[in-house]
Structure formats: C-alpha cells, structure tokens
Amino acid sequence: MTTDTRLEYDSLGAVEVPADCYWGAQTARSLKHFAIGSQRMPLAVIHAMARLKKAAAIANRDLGVLDPEKAKWIIQAADEVIAGQWDDQFPLAIWQTGSGTQTNMNVNEVIANRAIELAGGVKGSKSPIHPNDHVNCSQSSNDTFPTAMHVATVLALQERLLPTLRHLLTVLQEKAAAFAEIIKIGRTHLMDAVPLTLGQEFSGYASQIAAAQAHIEYALQHLYPLAIGATAVGTGLNAPAGFGDRVAAELAQMTGYPFRKAENPFAALAAHDPLVMLSGALKTLAAALMKIANDIRWLGSGPRCGLGELRLPANEPGSSIMPGKVNPTQCEALTMVCVQVMGNDAAVGIAGSQGNFELNVYKPLIIYNVLQSIALLSDAAQSFTDHCLVGVEPNRQQIQAYVERSLMLVTALNPHIGYDKAAAVAKKAYSEGKTLKEAAVELGYLTAEEFDRWVRLELMLGEKGTS
C-alpha cells in the first residue's frame, strides 16, 4: 500500500483514503473508529456478499431499475471479488456495527470503484457507478448482510463439512465391519462390564456421526430462505416488486443450491434462529467427536501401562524429554476443536437472543462463530480421519487377555444360579485370585461342565451386526 492518498466523500464529509485502495470513505471511517481485535470479517462472507451484489445487479437490470451498462460493470467487478482477486481490500474487523453495515459498504465501495475503473472512470469519483445508488440499489444492509450470512454458511456446509462427515462415517463403518468378530470387554462407569465386539463399539461411533450429520442437514434446509428484498425493516421499502424472488433465484442458479426468498421477512431481519439451530447441531457434532476421540485415545493408551486395546498411528515424536514417546495428538487436536465449538455455540445462542424489535445487531459475531465452527470441525475431522482413524488397529493379544481376566463374565450365570450367588462367585474369584470357573465349582453352585455350557462369549453379544 502506498502512502499517497485520495479524498473520498460520504454524508459526513471528506475522508483520506490510500490512493491504491478500492475501498472508500465508510470503510476508512470503520478502520479508524473500530480498531478492535485481530478478527477480520471472514472472506466467505465477502465472497457471498459479492455474489449477492452480482445477483442484485442482474435483478435490478431485468426489472428496469438499473442501466444495463452500469449493471455490466458491477457484474464484472463482483465476479473479480468472488474469484478472490481483491481479498486484500476487505480489512474490517467483525467488531463493528451489529448489522454488518460497514462490511456491506466496504463491498459496495470496492465493487463501485473497480467498476468505475473498468468503465474508464476515476476511482473515488462515484461516476459512473455509485456505491449506494447502483451497487446497493434496492437493498439495505439489514437484508444484504443476513442474506450473505446464509449463503456463506450453506457453501461452507455443502462444500466442506458435509463431505468431511461422509468420509468420516465411511471409515467408521469400515472399521466396525473389520472389527466385527473381535470380542472385548465393555466398560461402564469406567469399570469392567460384560463383553461386546470391537465392531459393535465402533458401530456406536458411526451411529453418532450419522445422527449428527442428519441434524446438520436438517438445519441446512432452514438456511435456504433469504432475507433479501426485506430492505430496512422487512417491508421491502425502495425495492421493486419481485426483487427478492429474482435475487434468490439468481443466487440459486449461481451456486446450485435452492435459495429462495424468506416467507416472513420480519423474522429474517430480527432473528437468526436458523443459524442458532445450526450452531446447536454443530455443538452436537462436537459432543459426538469429543466422545469418539476420547474413547480412541483411552483405548490406545500405553503402550505397556495403559489400556492398550488399540494401536494408533504415530504422527510425530511425542515428547521433548522422553525418547520414544508417541502421543495421541490427532485426538487431542480434535478435542480442543470440540471445546472451541461448544464455546462458539454459547456465544451464538446469546447473540441470537438479542434481536430487539425489527433487527438483530449481533450479526457479525454470529456469522464469525458459525463459520469458525464449520471450518474447525471440517479441518479437524478430516485430519483425525486421515491421520489417525484409518490407521487404527486392534491389539488382539491385549484384548484377549482382558477377556480372559474379566470377572464380569459371571453375569451370564445370573439366569441359572441367581444374582446373589453369581456375585459371590465374582467376589471369591477376585479376592482369592481364582478363575470364575474355579470359584463357582468350589462354592458348589455348579459343575465345571455347566460353567462351560452357560458362560459362552458368543452368546453374550446380542446382535453383532447392530449398527
């Protein structure tokens, strides 16, 4: 950026702007007055906003509101923003006006100045393209920003998170099938329990991910309705009839996703319940991933002094002081992401409750946290799947040793000798270091042959194919 400046003007007067920048007066004022934190408006929102400006230019042109030549320059400039050509022209923090007005104007100014340049004009002149009169024609920040929020979120879900979850689910299902015949001891309350198969255990993980994915896909359906056309308070003031429907249709054609104008524009401005719902679904996914990652790292603990039922792939040396140590780092990274997503959901829930009258003014905070949750979950789940889960293998020797030592196999005797006698068998075996069979026979509750007939692992597993 050069030190040369130019003067740009808004309703408050003149503002100095770096000469080589495409933003204008309102962006410059925001940079001056809202130098808060390091969090910038996500580029996903900027690109979604540029898609919206392109769709609006097309709709305004077709409705006779915008000159076709002006529309052409706006569309070309918007395409450049969508392509990421001007990503460095969007410097604003998320800590700004709660309606996202400053970001809306940042996009308007950049597109307008680039369109002016394409038309052969002078950057900053507002001629032949004006950021408000032409780029923002038929729009308000109050309907454009929430529209961009939905578009950005849908794209992030469809193109990042959902494909990652499908990959994760496939690997979990493959592991469940591969481990279907490996009998192990279950654990409840962190204590030994009755047996199940390792495949059954992994089928539970797969079911959790499938359910979380379904919750996200349900929430996704509520993000297709868009606020565009509502303008300032939901009445559509200054927007031509049919504008919102046309813009939504253009966005649907551009993206391939079924966007449509919201049935109730007032709720679309004043509340962000669909994003709150989605954030809750993301938290549910985080809870599932936390449980899965914790189980896998506990089952892989050791190698000699832990549970050691699973062998996890080594990604890197684990300690700067203990040679040969390898840690479950993919599980650790994933669980940290899950904690962050849960925190983000708390912020989104509070922000979503703060819609006063006709407008919620926590929009930048909501979209920042939702998009961060999607990005973190996408990246972490992909990393966990590719660098840990696919390489997980059973330690059959350790698993079998636990099965042979388990006292909870005594549960199979309950129907034959009763709970109290079965408990006495387990107590005697534990206190005297005997096998269950030895203890049961010595107590006179059954014969060795009866024990072998009744305590059979394959009869204690239920439906091994349960998923």
From Swiss-Prot:
<dbReference type="InterPro" id="IPR022761">
    <property type="entry name" value="Fumarate_lyase_N"/>
</dbReference>
<dbReference type="InterPro" id="IPR005677">
    <property type="entry name" value="Fum_hydII"/>
</dbReference>
<dbReference type="InterPro" id="IPR018951">
    <property type="entry name" value="Fumarase_C_C"/>
</dbReference>
<comment type="pathway">
    <text>Carbohydrate metabolism; tricarboxylic acid cycle; (S)-malate from fumarate: step 1/1.</text>
</comment>
<dbReference type="GO" id="GO:0006099">
    <property type="term" value="P:tricarboxylic acid cycle"/>
</dbReference>
<feature type="binding site">
    <location>
        <begin position="325"/>
        <end position="327"/>
    </location>
    <ligand>
        <name>substrate</name>
    </ligand>
</feature>
<dbReference type="InterPro" id="IPR008948">
    <property type="entry name" value="L-Aspartase-like"/>
</dbReference>
<dbReference type="Pfam" id="PF00206">
    <property type="entry name" value="Lyase_1"/>
</dbReference>
<dbReference type="GO" id="GO:0006106">
    <property type="term" value="P:fumarate metabolic process"/>
</dbReference>
<keyword id="KW-0963">Cytoplasm</keyword>
<protein>
    <recommendedName>
        <fullName>Fumarate hydratase class II</fullName>
        <ecNumber>4.2.1.2</ecNumber>
    </recommendedName>
</protein>
<keyword id="KW-0816">Tricarboxylic acid cycle</keyword>
<keyword id="KW-0456">Lyase</keyword>
<dbReference type="InterPro" id="IPR020557">
    <property type="entry name" value="Fumarate_lyase_CS"/>
</dbReference>
<feature type="active site" description="Proton donor/acceptor">
    <location>
        <position position="189"/>
    </location>
</feature>
<dbReference type="GO" id="GO:0006108">
    <property type="term" value="P:malate metabolic process"/>
</dbReference>
<feature type="binding site" description="in site B">
    <location>
        <begin position="130"/>
        <end position="133"/>
    </location>
    <ligand>
        <name>substrate</name>
    </ligand>
</feature>
<dbReference type="InterPro" id="IPR024083">
    <property type="entry name" value="Fumarase/histidase_N"/>
</dbReference>
<dbReference type="GO" id="GO:0004333">
    <property type="term" value="F:fumarate hydratase activity"/>
</dbReference>
<feature type="binding site">
    <location>
        <position position="320"/>
    </location>
    <ligand>
        <name>substrate</name>
    </ligand>
</feature>
<comment type="similarity">
    <text>Belongs to the class-II fumarase/aspartase family. Fumarase subfamily.</text>
</comment>
<comment type="subunit">
    <text>Homotetramer.</text>
</comment>
<feature type="binding site">
    <location>
        <begin position="99"/>
        <end position="101"/>
    </location>
    <ligand>
        <name>substrate</name>
    </ligand>
</feature>
<feature type="binding site">
    <location>
        <begin position="140"/>
        <end position="142"/>
    </location>
    <ligand>
        <name>substrate</name>
    </ligand>
</feature>
<feature type="site" description="Important for catalytic activity">
    <location>
        <position position="332"/>
    </location>
</feature>
<dbReference type="GO" id="GO:0005737">
    <property type="term" value="C:cytoplasm"/>
</dbReference>
<dbReference type="InterPro" id="IPR000362">
    <property type="entry name" value="Fumarate_lyase_fam"/>
</dbReference>
<dbReference type="Pfam" id="PF10415">
    <property type="entry name" value="FumaraseC_C"/>
</dbReference>
<feature type="active site">
    <location>
        <position position="319"/>
    </location>
</feature>
<comment type="function">
    <text>Involved in the TCA cycle. Catalyzes the stereospecific interconversion of fumarate to L-malate.</text>
</comment>
<feature type="binding site">
    <location>
        <position position="188"/>
    </location>
    <ligand>
        <name>substrate</name>
    </ligand>
</feature>
